[in-house]
């Protein structure tokens, strides 16, 4: 056992190291995890003989539960609502179109059987949220036309549909499925997945509001239990557990939950670990000696998928919405294949004993996708003029504050402010704060003591990040159209004695509240409630 623990720790450390190296040289980290697995595998340097596909399927399926759950939990529904219809159509109709177009190519061009052709189409019909957003975030790419939200919802929600198609075509390839059985399977998958997802989410919200966790970290453990049961319960009744996990995640993620920021950080780490696990196992299970036999069909399928099937499905779905051509091209290119395709391919490999090596074909397709699509995504975004340059000067400061023990705030000097017309050296600032930048129109000024503050100056102040703050519990409240707070001034609202509104988010902008601010539909109030 000690040997296994030692190897596991070494693999984790190497994955973290490779993640840092890959970010510097511009290669997606997930590709590095695959290569590391290959080096540890039976054909690699470490010669670890591991070919237990059934065991790997169980591990990877469990890992995918957390990836699906967090995919929903991290989705900002307020921002995603504008593209929800397009995203859902891409994640359902788009997946089906991709599956069938790819299946037709495999049958007629590669002379595969109908069953295996459509099974391969199902395995690679969904896109990978983790792959896309690890690249967008590491390269700090902001996309125009709300494309980031579109990709987030689509890639987070299309795995359940791909899973349903995979299960259906596995049954077909086994010869145990009739049209009636397939119809019943699809109905049960959708019905139990949606029903259990909503019920578990609502029950979880009730429990989270009733239970007060006395020990730090128990709320995260409780959420792990929710994620697991959100998959296991519907799956027990032949429902779509991945769909249920995603629904539970998206409902809980957009509900007022205590300590949500820490939960996000926790699941961010868990999801990162699950990605390492899945892609490392993919490399470990593979036999590089078998890859030359599948590289040609895998490359042909990848090219067809990338340049025909995916663009055609995107065009059929987005053109009726009059989406711009360059947005459609970027969405098409962003269809990276990853974790879900790997897990489903292992599932198919264990369930079907076909002569064709479906696992290594999917392995090569994922490899091509991450290497080519992933590496070129920033370049494609620039060439299509889809980068939305940040208008807010604070973006750079926020990026820096993630790595240093310092935070930045900004304030605009209004007319008749006490600081107007005064030199910096004559101002009385709060203790341990410093004005580090003044933005005056289009000019950025590094101030000194002789700098004079003018009306409409935007001041950026730095302050030390606290190690730990006690007594603060932040919750969010969304102002709906029928809310009794809608269209009222803050001064007209009666508040509890132990809470204060510290921030209002409106159309992507942050408003520091005062009594003269009037609330409107869609406002997100960030409230601090005292903790005793």
At which residue positions do the language-model features occur?
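Transmembrane helical cores of multi-pass secondary ion antiporters/exchangers
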Residues: 1-390, 403
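Cytosolic regulatory regions of ion transport systems
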Residues: 312, 318-330, 340, 344-532
């Amino acid at each position: 056992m000690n040997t296994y623990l030692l190897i596991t720790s070494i693999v984790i450390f190497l994955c973290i190291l490779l993640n840092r190296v890959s970010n510097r040289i511009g290669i997606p980290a997930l590709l590095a995890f695959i290569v590391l697995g290959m080096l540890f595998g039976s054909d690699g340097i470490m010669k670890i003989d591991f070919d237990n596909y059934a065991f790997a399927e169980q591990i990877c399926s469990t890992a995918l539960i957390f990836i699906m759950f967090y995919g929903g939990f991290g989705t900002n529904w307020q921002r995603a609502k504008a593209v929800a219809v397009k995203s859902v159509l891409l994640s359902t109709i788009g997946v089906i179109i991709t599956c069938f177009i790819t299946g037709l190519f495999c049958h007629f061009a590669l002379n595969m059987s109908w069953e295996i052709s459509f099974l391969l189409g199902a395995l690679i019909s969904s896109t990978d949220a983790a792959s896309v957003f690890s690249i967008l975030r590491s390269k700090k790419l902001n996309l125009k036309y709300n494309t980031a939200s579109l990709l987030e919802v689509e890639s987070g929600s299309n795995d359940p549909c791909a899973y349903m198609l995979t299960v259906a075509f596995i049954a077909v390839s086994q010869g145990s499925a009739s049209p009636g059985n397939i119809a019943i399977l699809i109905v049960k998958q959708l019905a139990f997945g949606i029903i259990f997802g909503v019920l578990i989410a609502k029950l979880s919200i009730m429990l989270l509001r009733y239970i007060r966790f006395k020990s730090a970290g128990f709320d995260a453990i409780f959420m792990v239990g929710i994620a697991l049961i959100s998959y296991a319960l519907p799956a027990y009744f032949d429902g779509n557990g991945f769909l249920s996990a995603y629904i539970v995640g998206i409902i809980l993620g957009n509900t007022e939950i205590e300590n949500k920021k820490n939960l996000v950080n926790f699941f961010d780490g868990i999801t990162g670990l699950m990605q390492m696990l899945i892609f490392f196992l993919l490399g470990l299970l593979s036999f590089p000696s078998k890859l030359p036999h599948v590289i040609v069909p895998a490359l042909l399928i990848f090219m067809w998928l990338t340049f025909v099937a995916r663009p055609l499905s995107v065009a059929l779905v987005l053109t009726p919405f009059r989406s711009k051509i360059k947005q459609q091209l970027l969405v098409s290119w962003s269809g990276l294949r990853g974790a879900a395709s790997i897990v489903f391919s292992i599932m198919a490999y264990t369930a079907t004993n076909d002569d064709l090596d479906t696992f290594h074909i999917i392995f090569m397709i994922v490899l091509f996708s991450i290497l080519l699509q992933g590496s070129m995504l920033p370049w494609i975004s620039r060439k299509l003029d889809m980068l939305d340059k940040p208008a807010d000067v604070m973006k750079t400061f926020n990026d820096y504050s993630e790595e240093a023990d310092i935070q930045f705030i900004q304030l605009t000097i209004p007319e008749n402010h006490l600081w107007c017309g005064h030199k910096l050296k004559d101002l009385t600032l709060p203790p341990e704060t410093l004005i580090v930048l003044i933005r005056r129109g289009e000019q950025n000024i590094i101030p000194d003591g002789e700098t004079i503050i003018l009306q409409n100056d935007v001041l950026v102040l730095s302050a030390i990040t606290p190690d730990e703050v006690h007594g603060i519990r932040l919750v969010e409240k969304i102002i709906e159209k029928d809310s009794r707070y809608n269209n009222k001034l803050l001064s007209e609202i009666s508040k509890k004695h132990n809470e204060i509104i510290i921030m209002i988010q409106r159309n992507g902008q942050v408003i520091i509240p005062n009594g003269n601010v009037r609330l409107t539909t869609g406002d997100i109030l960030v409230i601090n409630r005292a903790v005793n």
